[in-house]
Amino acid sequence: MSKVKIGVFGGYRGMTMIRQAIDHPDASLVAVCDKYEPLLEQCRSLASEHGVKVELFADFDDFIQCDMDAVVLANYANEHAPYAIRCLESGRHVMSEVLTCATLKEAVELVEAVERSGKVYQYAENYCYFNTTFEMRQRYQRGDIGELMHAEGEYIHDCSSIWPQITYGEREHWRNTMYSTFYCTHSLGPILFASGLRPVSVVGFETRNMPFMRELGTKAGTAGMEIVMLENGAMVKSIHGGLKREPGSINYQM
């Protein structure tokens, strides 16, 4: 079987996938795209250490011309859908890590692009792949806890100490500008994965923009909460964000 030729768009968020593509026996890392030259140099050194030939690009339009079977999207989280659609329409499979889309309009356009292309689209919300999440799924699907009626997911992570690093010091970086309910997948994803149930309605709330985050450039609330109704009538409370708590909290209950 020939190896799957993989390109990664986004060298910082995508570094884990870059390493896995280099190490996986059925994959071949062929290209990386990132606008920051230091990250490309890091990828160049990593590829050289492993004896792998990888093309490096600073522009997506050049990157998409490379001979690739699949693309890992690890670019800015609020820009995945347009790039996923371009990759699908060019005949590539797509893995998005993370997020899927920023609006309902983008969600519809993405689904339609997948259907037209016939290619595989994988949403790689990483907290769905923890051992504990698989244990939750196995127990629920086996019927150990009956039918789900209420669940809670919590992901509290104060990133203020690394904010300049993860935003590259950009005042208009998506982490500074997007509404706080946007990045809900760490808290909500494992519940949906474990139960296999689809959400049918949602209402969301933001906390106020706390001074310690506002000083770093954020424009939205410091944390977000969603109340989600699932297709069987179950309710899920999802809370996430950068509230001050040491240590951080990752917690799921069903």
What do these predicted regions represent?
Residues 1-50:
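N-terminal Rossmann-like dinucleotide-binding module
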Residues 12, 127-219:
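Predominantly a Rossmann-like dinucleotide-binding segment in NAD(P)-dependent oxidoreductases
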Residues 31, 70, 150:
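Short, Asp-centered acidic motifs that coordinate Mg2+ and/or phosphate
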Residues 49-55, 116-120:
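A short helix-to-beta-strand connector/capping loop
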Residues 55-66:
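Short acidic low-complexity segments
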Residues 69-70, 76-77, 81-129, 143:
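Beta-strand-loop-alpha-helix segment that lines the small-molecule cofactor/substrate pocket
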Residues 74-75, 97, 230, 239:
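Short, well-ordered coil/turn residues at beta-beta hairpins
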Residues 215-216, 231-254:
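NAD(P)-dinucleotide binding in Rossmann-like oxidoreductases
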